[in-house]
Amino acid sequence: SVAQHLLHRFKPRRFESSQQSDMIPIRHMKINFKAETLNPRFYLNSELASAYFSSLSIFLTYGEELVIDTARYHRKFLQDARLKQRVTALIGQEALHSKVHEELNEALKEADFPVQLFRSMAEFVFNYGFNRLPQPMKLSLMAAIEHFTAVLAEYMMQHEEIFFHSCDDQQRAIWMWHMLEESEHKDIAYDVFQDLSNHYGLRIAGFFPAFITILVLIMAAACFVPLYRRPKNLISFNYWRSVPEGWQLLFGLKKGVYGSSWKHIFAYLHPRFHPNDFDTTAHLEYYKTRLLDPKNGILAPYFVKEFTPALTQVAS
């Protein structure tokens, strides 16, 4: 019947163990950031767009801690051994992202970025907001945060001409490494949500706080950065003339990071959405070689080691 067809079409998918992605490694990177070599215009020579990524780096460490804590809490409830192993890998990758971004943030602080102010803002949002949420809502928020990083990762991989012509090799390295791994584990948090909850209303409830934080709050913070670092920008014709271009780089509908990704962003609201509906397999294989090749890879100078967590059986 029509009713049954519609019910099937809009009923959230269940977690399917057999359809999980491959297991993923945890990679250690060492990038020796120095304040004097950080380029505040590393992203296409745009001060505003670059400030967004610098601000995102500061807030990301708090988001990653939420993901780690939430994943660790829910891991013990999983009955699928492979999913449990993948959650362990997710925790490992996110812990290293947080560590290296914190090193970048310390260098940004020395370079007169308002790091301490933004840390205080992030601590307020997380300590008095997100971290006080009940665990089911945290699980939903974790899945939503991972969705937005997956959107950013796919954009980066689809626009090689942008991210491989950065004005700062070290900032390019951290973002390319981070986004490679975000794409690798983009479905893990969602699979955990599917397995333990799969409640559509709860999933949507987690989407909007993530949306507001990543696209509104962090962007508002980014607008403050160029004025804080260089107060004369307030009366600089050249700076204000560059602002629309910076805005277009982030939110332009044709090539903007988020503006051109709006279909991917809002696909999350479809009841039968799954992260792997957006297939990045070919991109991942290409970038693993492009970034990690021992001789010519972009990340080779920063690579330390990698390992894959062991698969352990879940007690019945």
Residue ranges and their predicted role:
Residues L6, F10, S17-S316:
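Non-heme di-metal
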